[in-house]
């Protein structure tokens, strides 16, 4: 089952900065896509990371250590477990 983890670019950058380029976690995070949303002439950006549940839990553990503000966003994605076909 694939999970779509959707977090703010600031939280994403904070978590990513804790890992070296050789780290498996770095590779998982780098698979994220920056998505631009437009609402009432305002632009909002999010980073979407499509991964399996195991990797989503790894991202959650990293957020708990390095960016507690991102935990709720990631927990919600895991809870919803949106599947893509």
Model regions: which residues?
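Short intrinsically disordered terminal tails
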Residues: 1-2, 79-85
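Short, solvent-exposed polar/charged micro-motifs at secondary-structure junctions
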Residues: 14-15, 47-48, 82-84
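N-terminal acidic leader/helix
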Residues: 2-28
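Acidic, low-complexity, intrinsically disordered interaction modules
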Residues: 19-71
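Long, compositionally biased, charged low-complexity segments
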Residues: 11-12, 70, 74-82
């Amino acid at each position: 089952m694939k999970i779509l983890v959707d977090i703010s670019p600031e939280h994403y950058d904070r978590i990513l900065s804790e890992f070296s380029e050789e780290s498996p976690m770095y590779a998982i995070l780098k698979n994220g896509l920056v998505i631009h949303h437009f609402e009432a002439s305002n632009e909002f950006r999010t980073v979407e990371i499509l991964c399996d549940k195991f990797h989503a839990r790894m991202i959650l553990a990293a957020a708990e250590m390095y960016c507690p503000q991102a935990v709720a966003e990631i927990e919600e994605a895991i809870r919803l477990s949106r599947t893509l076909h």
